[in-house]
Amino acid sequence: MDTPISWIKAYVPDLDCTPQEYADKMTLSGSNMESVTYLDKNLEKIVVGKIEKIEKHPDADKLIICQVNVGDETIQIVTGAPNVSEGDLVPVVLDGGRVAGGHDGGKNPEDGIKIKKGKLRGVESFGMMCSIEELGSSRDMYPEAPEYGIYIFNKDVKPGDDAVEALGLRDAVVEFEITSNRVDCFSMIGMAREAAATFKKDFYPPVVTKTGNDEDVNDYIKVRVEDVDLCPRYTARVVKNIKLAPSPEWMQRRLSAMGIRPINNLVDITNYVMEEYGQPMHAYDLDTISNKEIVVRRAKAGDKFTTLDGEERTMDENVLMICDGEKEIGIAGIMGGANSMVTDDIKTLLFEAACFDGTNIRLSSKRIGLRTDASGKFEKGLDPENAMAAMDRACQLIEELGAGEVVGGAVDVYPNPVKQIRLPLEVDKMNALLGTNVSKEEVLEYFARIELGYDEATNEVIVPSFRQDLHRMADLAEEVARFYGYDNIPVTLPNGESTAGKKPFKIRVEDVCRNVAEQNGFSGGMTYSFESPKVFDKLLLPEDAKERQAIEISNPLGEDFSIMRTVSLNGMLTSLATNLAHRNKNVRLYEFGNIYIPKALPLTELPDERMQMTLGMYGECDFFTLKGVVEDILDSLGLGGTSEYTPTTKHPFLHPGRAADITIDGEKIAYIGQIHPEVMDNYNMKGEVYVAVIDMPTLVPKATFDRKYEGVAKFPAMKRDLSMVMKKDIFVGQLEKIFKDKGGKLLESYELFDVYEGDQIEKGYKSVAYSLTFRAKDRTLEDAEVSKIVEKILDELKKLGVELRA
C-alpha cells in the first residue's frame, strides 16, 4: 500500500515527523514498511522562472536565448526547447543545482545530474529550464506536460517560488506491506487512522455532507440482487448533466503520487475514492442501460462477454454479472463491459458501490484470466458498511468539482446487515498472554485510538465493522501489544518444570517404517491429497468401485485438484513416472499420507482418514525385492513370521498373478504387487514397477517393541529336509501355513532352500525343498517324536496334492 505523506497529513494535520521517522514508527506498531520513495530526490535549487525575453541564437538555428526572471535576479539561459514563449512560467534549475534525470525519459542516475553554468555555441547559459522527465516524473502523472519540451505552469505561481513544491513533488511515498487480514489498511483513511493512533494525534476523516437534488433516484433506476451471498450489499446513485473536465490539481497530484494517471474529473473521482476509502466503484452510462434496471446474477455457462479492454471472455455459472433488463453490462467486482462504457458525450451516469464475496471474485478473476485493481481489493473481503460511505463521498466530490448534478436519494440493497461484534474485555488474560502489566485504563485508551468502543455495562469491547480481523481475546491482546510497544514488553523465560518428552506409539511405529525403508535405499516424498476424478480411470477402477466414492472439494484450485484421494497410488506412480522420464534408472520411493474414505455422501460426518505407507520401486528389483523390504518392516515391529501372503485379483491396477494381500491373524494389513501393464501405459511408463501399500491404522495395534531374552539353546536341534513335488499354482505360503499349524511349538524354524522346474519334473509341476528345524527347550528330542510331527505335516500336504520327491 503506497501512502503519500502529504495525503496522510490531510487527515492527521498535527503529524510532525520525517518520512523515515513515520515509516519506522509505523513499522513498530504493526504496519511493516517496504520502502520510502522521495519524490523530490535529486531536485535541488529549482525555482519558478518567468521568461521575460527571447532572442535567436546568433550561431545556431535550433537554439534560443532566454532572459528568465527567477525572483531575485534575471539570468540568461540558452535552450533548444521548441515550446516556450515570452511570459511563460517554467521550472528553472540554477547554477550548482541538480535534476533527477535527462529529458529522454531513460533511467535516472542514482545521484541525478548536476547543472553548471557554461556556454552553448559561444553564448553563456546560467541555468536550465526543465522538462517534466528531468524532474523525475512523466506525462502519465502530469498529462498537461508537453510531449517534447519544457514544462509550463498553468497555475498561480510567481518567479522565485519553489518549483518542486509547486509541482507537488516535495513529498515522500511510503510503501507498506499490508497483510490480507487488515483490509481497512488498504485505504488512505485506514492508514491515516493507524498513523493517528501510533503518533497519538487527532484523526480528521473527510466530512461528508448530504448531496442530491429534490428528485428520487428510484425514478431513474431499479436494482434486483438475485444472489445475496455473492453480493451482500449493492448501492447505486445517479448523476445527470455530466460535465467532463480535468480534475483539480490537488486531486491529480495525490493520484500521481499513488502511481495513478489522472484522466478527467469523473474517472479521477472514482479512483480517488477507491484509494481514499478502499472501496472500488464503477460508473455506467445510464442511457445504455435497458429498462433502467440493474440485475445482479450469476452468468450462464458459456456466455461470451466483451470487457472494457475489448477482449471477449467466456463466462461460467460461478461468475457474478451486473446486468440490465436485457444483457450483461459488467463482471461484478472485476471490470465493466464495453457496451456500457463511459464516453466523452455521456449525459447521465449510474454510480455503483457494492460489496462482493471475496472468494468468488478471486476465483472468477482466475477463471477468466483478468485481474484488476478493483478485483484485488474485493478479493480480500471488504466491509459492507463502507459501500454507502464511499458512494456519498464520491457524490460529494461530484458536486464540489461541478462534474454533474446528483439525483436525490440512493438505492441500497442490503438485506442482511453486518452484525456488531462484541468481545469481553479480559485485561488479566491479555496481560498473562503478553507478559505485561497494563491497566484497564491504558487498554481502553489504546482501543479508543483505533475506534474500538466499550460498553461499561457489559464490560464488552465493541468492534467496528472495518476491523474484520478482531474475533477473540488474543486479537485484542495483539492491539494492546502494538501500542504498548513490542520493544517495551520484558523478555522473560517461561515458568514450569521441564519434563522428558515421549513420542506416541503411532509415531514410533511410523519412524521405524521410515528408517527401515531408508536403510533399504528408499527416499521419502509427499504428494497432494487432492486429485482429479480421472485418476480412477487411469487406475482401471470399475465404475462401481468404492474408491470412486470420493469427497468433492467445494472450491478446488482446478479439476486436477477437485477430490480428496481414496487410494494412495496416483501420487506414487506420478512421482515414479517423473523419475523415469528424467532417466533415473533405479528409483525407490516411499510416502506417508492419508486417504479419505467418506462414511456417506454427501458428508454428514467427518470421513475416515487412514494413514497409508506407500512404497514404489523400479529398476534392479522384482516382486521379492519389495516383499523383502515389507518383511524387514514387519520384523522391526516384532511381527516377523506372523504374516501370510494370499494371491489376489481384487486390485485392478495390479498385474494379475503378481499381486498379494498381506494378512496377520486373518486381518489384512497391506497389499503388494506389480503394476498392471495398462496402468503403466496410462502413466507413460515402460518396464516393471512394484508397489506395496501398508494400512497403518491396522498395522499399528499389532506392532510391539517388547523384546524377550532367550538364552543359548541347551539342547540340540534336529533337522529334516523335505523335497516336494507339486503343481505350479500352489504357493509356498500355503506350505508354510501347514508347517506352522502342524509343527507346533517344537518347530523352531523353516527355510526354503531350493525351487526347481525342468526336464526331471513333470510339465506343470515344480520341486520345492525346505529345511525344517525342531528343538525342545527342556529335553533332547527323539527321532520318533520328530518323525511323528513330519508325518502330520506330510498328511496335510497330501490334501493339497503335494508329494515327496522320490
Predicted feature locations:
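Phosphate-backbone binding interfaces of nucleic-acid-interacting proteins
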Residues: 1-215, 350, 369, 373, ...
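Glycine/proline-enriched, intrinsically flexible loops and inter-domain linkers
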Residues: 24, 64, 203-304
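Beta-rich nucleic-acid/ligand-interaction surfaces
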Residues: 40-44, 211-213, 498-503, 527-546, ...
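Conserved mixed alpha/beta core segments that line enzyme active sites in large multi-domain catalysts
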Residues: 48-78, 159, 264, 270-339
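Mobile "lid/hinge" segments at catalytic clefts and subdomain interfaces of large enzymes
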Residues: 121-130, 134-136, 140, 145-149, ...
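Terminal amphipathic helices with adjacent charged low-complexity linkers/tails
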Residues: 199-225, 402-430, 437
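Extended, well-folded interaction surfaces typified by the phenylalanyl-tRNA synthetase beta subunit core
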Residues: 423-585, 720, 773-776, 781, ...
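A carboxyl-terminal module marker
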Residues: 449-452, 469, 599-603, 608-609, ...
